[in-house]
Regions:
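Compact beta-sheet-dominated domain cores in extracellular/mature segments
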Residues: 1-404
């Protein structure tokens, strides 16, 4: 079980397994079709032209040290004598390798994952056409009855109905203490179960009234909310006493971080209330390699945050400092040493190095134009509103994106 993605498949060393599903970009597709390997030991030197307005054929940065796709994404090779089973099959590459595939998608591990349970290489969370074709962790289907599904969010595995309605519990309610009655039922609909339904895992059935059975999670009856007007909405969690349901929950940020209300929802902020921003980036090579980790080329980030000048970048976007003894208690949040002039990892004691907070191994920032708690003036800075190469606020709750 991982902190951010729930249950995942791993190799024998505990490294998370990923696939690279084909993804529609602005000028074509990238990623891998089912049954076809596209990630090879070839160093790509030019852009593919998949993201307008950039043309194909432009030289990529740092070619003298540029890795190949398989340097960063290691194929999970088939050992002699192994046989396909279930959704696990074998695909053959143009280089003759035999590689495991899950649901026909070739499987890899990430060079960024250092310990069992790490998912630094990618996420199951959905993303739009502005971002690069991402690698996704794979795992077993969540253990939920057929009436439910689970979506990975910033808070954890959000439990929803099969038609993507959020479900809720009322604090203090249990099978023997049904509190939502009378006028409460005008807004909250009990999630009733058919006659042949059976409990499974953390899900059970409680008798709401003679002959009427209601789904429950950890013994607490489940409801939907009438004002959730679309898929994935979470408006009901704003009502006192009501909470969303998560199959697993992500770890809390370090204790010095705070939550702040904005005109568009709620964001994570530092101890002074300044909004926290995350940087994301994917290059325009056919391999769609990442460029947002301290081990990646920094020219993309420097272009966005400071017109190529690291000093201007630091004036505009401030690293969030961490104390020398700072600890978070999780792998998702870590205090790391960074050289602010290069953006790369450094060591304690190196002149100019800073100890800063990082999320998923990537430093987080505040923005110089945010003057008071709740300001989000740096949100969507960069290419395609920050989705391709840029910075976005760390949204705890975004009212314009259904609360996620």
């Amino acid at each position: 079980m991982t902190e951010l993605e729930g249950a995942v498949f791993t190799d024998e060393a505990g490294h998370t397994l990923y696939t690279w599903p084909q993804h529609l970009l602005r000028n074509g597709y990238s990623g891998e079709q089912k049954g076809r390997i596209e990630c090879y030991d070839i160093v790509r030197t030019k852009t593919a032209g998949l993201m307008s307005p950039y043309p194909p054929g432009v030289l990529l940065p740092e070619l003298d040290t540029r890795p190949s796709c398989t340097d960063l994404w290691r194929p999970v090779l088939v050992l002699e004598g192994a046989e396909p089973i279930g959704k696990w099959s074998i695909v053959e590459g143009q280089d003759g390798r035999r590689q495991w595939a899950y649901d026909e998608q070739p499987v890899y591990t990430s060079h960024l994952d250092q310990e069992p349970g790490d998912t630094t290489g990618g996420t199951k969370r959905r993303y739009g056409g502005e971002g690069a074709a991402a690698r996704n962790p794979i795992g077993p289907p969540p253990r939920v009855p057929p009436a439910f599904r689970v979506m990975t969010t910033a808070h954890g595995g959000l439990v929803m109905t099969r038609d993507a309605r959020s479900v809720y519990i009322l604090n203090g309610e249990s099978e023997g203490q049904i509190r939502c009655t009378g006028d409460c039922l005008d807004s909250w609909q009990p999630l009733t179960a058919p006659a042949l339904a059976r409990g499974d895992g953390l899900f059970s059935l409680v008798e709401r009234s003679p002959g009427v059975r209601q789904w429950a999670f950890r013994g607490q009856p489940l409801y939907t909310y009438s004002l959730d007007s679309g898929e994935d909405w979470m408006v009901g969690s704003d009502v006192s006493g009501w909470s969303n349901v998560y199959l697993w929950e992500t770890p809390e940020p370090p204790e010095e971080f705070t939550a702040q209300d904005t005109i568009a929802g709620q964001v994570l902020a530092d101890a002074q209330g300044r909004t926290i921003y995350l940087y994301s980036c994917g290059d325009d090579s056919i391999d769609q390699l990442g460029c947002d980790h301290p081990t990646d080329p920094q020219v993309y980030r420097l272009a966005i945050c400071g017109r190529g000048d690291p000093e201007v970048c630091q004036e505009n976007w401030h690293y969030v400092p961490a104390k020398d003894d700072a600890e978070s208690g999780s792998r998702a949040w870590r205090a790391v040493w960074i050289d602010p002039m290069t953006g790369r990892f450094s060591d304690a004691g190196v002149e100019g190095a800073m100890r800063v907070w990082a999320y998923r191994d990537r430093p987080v920032y505040t923005y110089f134009l945010d003057e008071k708690p709740g300001d989000v003036r740096g949100d969507a800075t960069g290419e395609w509103r920050g989705g391709r190469n840029g910075l976005k606020a760390y949204w705890i709750r975004n009212a314009y994106f259904r609360g996620q």
